UniProtKB/Swiss-Prot annotation:
The gene is rplI. The keyword Metal-binding does not apply. This is Large ribosomal subunit protein bL9. Binds to the 23S rRNA. One of its GO terms (molecular function) is structural constituent of ribosome. GO terms for cellular component: ribonucleoprotein complex; ribosome.
Length: 147
């Protein structure tokens, strides 16, 4: 019996796959528990349409991420921080500080996506890498100046 898995099933397959299982396993376990649906022509057509829609959505998200990466690469951020002698900061600049500075410029980016090369503890120019999407990153210049 061919079924389309609705959810991941251990030792059978992942959601969205069409798998061949024994009739009893399909009718008595997978279908009643909502783990699979029977692989009829209409269900297969629906699955293909769903996959195409997901692919279109992924493409759209990728395009948006590339667009945002271009905009971000042109933006620089200046952070004014209290510093002592020789440009040594009191504390350090974190991804949260960069997130807030980007928010002021109109970019909503989660701090978890911002990767700093190291903890910034001195004044100077650094580059933060922002991971926007799978394989799409943007580099933002971060200038740290004494207050």
């Amino acid at each position: 019996m061919k079924v389309i898995l609705v959810k991941d099933v251990k030792n059978v397959g992942k959601a969205g796959e069409v798998v061949n299982v024994s009739d009893g396993y399909g009718r008595n376990y997978l279908i009643p528990k909502g783990l699979a649906i029977e692989a009829t022509e209409s269900n297969l057509k629906m699955l293909n349409e769903k996959k195409k829609a997901e692919e279109r959505k992924r493409q759209q998200e990728l395009e948006q991420a590339k667009e945002l990466a271009q905009k971000l690469s042109k933006v620089g951020v200046t952070l004014k921080v209290k510093a002592g002698e020789n440009g040594k900061l009191f504390g350090s600049v974190t991804s949260k500080d960069v997130e807030e500075a980007l928010k002021e410029k109109g970019f909503e980016i989660d701090k978890k996506k911002i990767v700093l090369p190291e903890n910034i503890k001195t004044t100077g120019t650094y580059y933060a890498e922002i991971k926007l999407y799978q394989g799409v990153t943007a580099k933002v210049q971060v200038d740290v100046v004494a207050e």
